[in-house]
Regions:
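Short, aromatic/basic-rich helix-turn unit that serves as a nucleic-acid recognition element
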Residues: 1-25
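N-terminal DNA-binding recognition helix of tyrosine site-specific recombinases/integrases
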Residues: 16, 27-34, 38-40, 48, ...
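Basic, Lys/Arg- and aromatic-enriched nucleic-acid-binding interface segment
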Residues: 67-71, 75-79, 90-149, 167
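C-terminal catalytic core of Y-nucleophile DNA break-rejoin enzymes
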Residues: 108, 175-194, 202-223
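Catalytic-site neighborhood detector that most strongly recognizes the C-terminal catalytic loop/helix
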Residues: 113, 174-178, 214, 262-287
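C-terminal catalytic core of tyrosine-transesterase DNA break-rejoin enzymes
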Residues: 140, 144-151, 223, 240-265, ...
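Short, polar N-cap/turn motifs at the start of nucleic acid-interacting alpha helices
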Residues: 159-166, 231-232, 252-272, 279, ...
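C-terminal secondary-structure termini that scaffold catalytic or DNA-interacting sites
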Residues: 199-203, 288-310
Length: 310
């Protein structure tokens, strides 16, 4: 089934989606191995198999990760397994669909982003090490364009186009979904491109920015956050979230436009950011209310030495 499914999705899904299926397939094989099995008959795939696979994922610590998978990550793997098993069911390789009574449940999570103040502090901080400055600049470019790390690392001068407005745009295809993305370049983003135009590493690689591995970039982001006094966990996902919230939606850009700039295939994905902003407004209003209430409770001091002049 795994081999058939892998062959079927070749060339039909984005590379990132295919890679995710491969990761799920590897976990299924590890789960079988943990039960001293190399393979299993499709007829033995039942509701208990799904429950046991879920338990295996919940307790499994992926290599190089400090903790087990989150609930939502586990659900994503089970979702992908369901697609494979339902394919077998529709091909009539299975008499019953083991997932007919299964319900995937996802926990609502807030997407962290940098506030305007945090973004400004990060942009103006002077780093003593060039490697940290470089990764900070990559992060900032993502904050001002919404371009993901995977796509950012591949950008070349050929991705810069001149629009009808005579302004420069980044035009690229998202690696994750293969969606065409066109993003107008703001002055900050243009300055960052210009900064690295003649950098020795970009001249060798032919890219807009000096290339760096994802692992190393994430390692340096931790140092950057510590140096800037940020308690938030800096990631390139957060940079995209910052573009969606602080840079665009907070400044009145329509959600449909933001969705297009981010390369989302569904506007529902972008609406998550709008809900995050609504929650922040609610929290800020609650804080303001607390301040106003504390002021109203403060006893007023009598004014001494007051004379009435007639």
């Amino acid at each position: 089934l795994i081999d058939y499914h892998s062959e079927k999705i070749k060339g039909t899904l984005a590379k990132g989606t295919i890679r995710n299926f491969q990761i799920t397939e590897n976990y299924v094989l590890k789960f079988l191995k943990s039960n001293k099995l190399e393979d299993i008959f499709l007829s033995r795939l039942d509701y208990k198999f799904i429950c046991d696979f879920e338990s295996f994922l919940v307790q499994y610590y992926p290599k190089g990760h400090p903790r087990a998978m989150s609930h939502n990550t586990v659900m994503k793997h089970i979702q992908r397994l369901r697609k494979m098993i339902r394919l077998a069911y529709h091909l009539e390789w299975l008499d019953k669909d083991p997932f007919r009574r299964w319900k995937t449940t996802f926990e609502k999570t807030d997407r962290e982003f940098l506030s305007e103040h945090e973004l400004s502090n990060l942009a103006t901080y002077e780093f003593p090490l060039e490697r940290l400055e470089r990764v900070r600049d990559l992060f900032l470019f993502s904050c001002y364009t919404g371009i993901s790390y995977a796509d950012l690392n591949k950008l070349t001068p050929n991705n810069i186009w001149k629009g009808e407005d005579d302004k420069k745009w980044i035009v690229t295809n998202r690696q994750k979904t293969n969606t065409r993305v066109k993003v107008p370049l703001m002055p900050t983003a243009l300055r960052l491109i210009e900064k690295y135009r003649e950098h020795p590493l970009t001249e060798v690689s032919g890219t807009l920015f000096p290339p760096i591995t994802n692992e190393r970039a994430n390692l340096y982001l931790k140092e950057i956050a510590e140096a800037c006094g940020l308690t938030k966990n800096l990631t390139f996902h957060m940079a995209r979230h910052t573009f969606a919230t602080t840079v665009t939606l907070s400044n009145g850009m329509p959600i449909e436009t933001v969705s297009k700039l981010l390369g989302h295939t569904k506007i529902a994905t972008t609406q998550i950011y709008a809900r995050v902003l609504d929650k922040k407004v609610e929290e800020d209003m609650n804080k303001l209310q607390e301040v106003l209430q504390s002021k109203s409770k403060t006893p007023k001091r009598p004014i001494s030495n007051l004379k009435i002049i007639r």
